[in-house]
Design a protein with these regions (language model features):
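NAD(P)-dependent Rossmann-like dehydrogenase/reductase catalytic/cofactor-binding core
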Residues: 10-35, 39, 47, 53-145
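Short, charged, surface-exposed secondary-structure boundary motifs
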Residues: 1-3, 18
Length: 145
């Protein structure tokens, strides 16, 4: 899947059609979207990840249980904490910080203490061997903390 971003008044229909066709030749499913923060996928995914972190911070579930619930209950391949560790906690934090700067009054982008702490400690996820979960190596799965 790839997001084909259309900038209103700038991107021609011919350009969009060319990119859509090229994506199809690559075996990708292309979706059109306008130029907004996060486009479609990250605009939906990142607030979901933040809410999972807040849910855990409020004591409503362990990281492990929240991950299992979303994998089994929503048929997601990765739970939110696994996904954050896969993306890189520094990358997730950078997205949050950028979106908060763009939309400072939006509560979806309020800081998450646990994320801020882990990033400040250098625990960035799989790439450093620790994030929300600990990893024996970059290729192995997570272990319950």
């Amino acid at each position: 899947m790839c997001e084909v971003v259309e900038v209103q008044g700038v991107t021609s229909e011919e350009t969009i059609e060319t990119i859509m066709e090229f994506s199809k030749r690559l075996g990708k499913v292309a979706v059109r979207c306008d130029d907004n923060v996060g486009y479609v996928v990250d605009r939906l995914r990142i607030p979901y990840l933040f809410e999972a972190m807040r849910l855990h911070e409020r004591g409503h579930g362990s990281m492990f249980d929240i991950d299992v619930a979303m994998k089994l209950g929503a048929n997601y391949k990765l739970g939110p904490f696994e996904l954050c560790d896969h993306i890189g906690l520094d990358n997730v934090k950078n997205m949050m910080d950028g979106w908060r700067k763009a939309e400072p009054d939006n509560p979806l982008y309020a800081p998450v203490a646990t994320l801020d702490r882990l990033v400040s400690e250098g625990k960035l996820g799989k790439k450093t061997g620790a994030g929300f979960f600990k990893y024996k190596s970059k290729r192995e799965g997570w272990s319950k903390r």
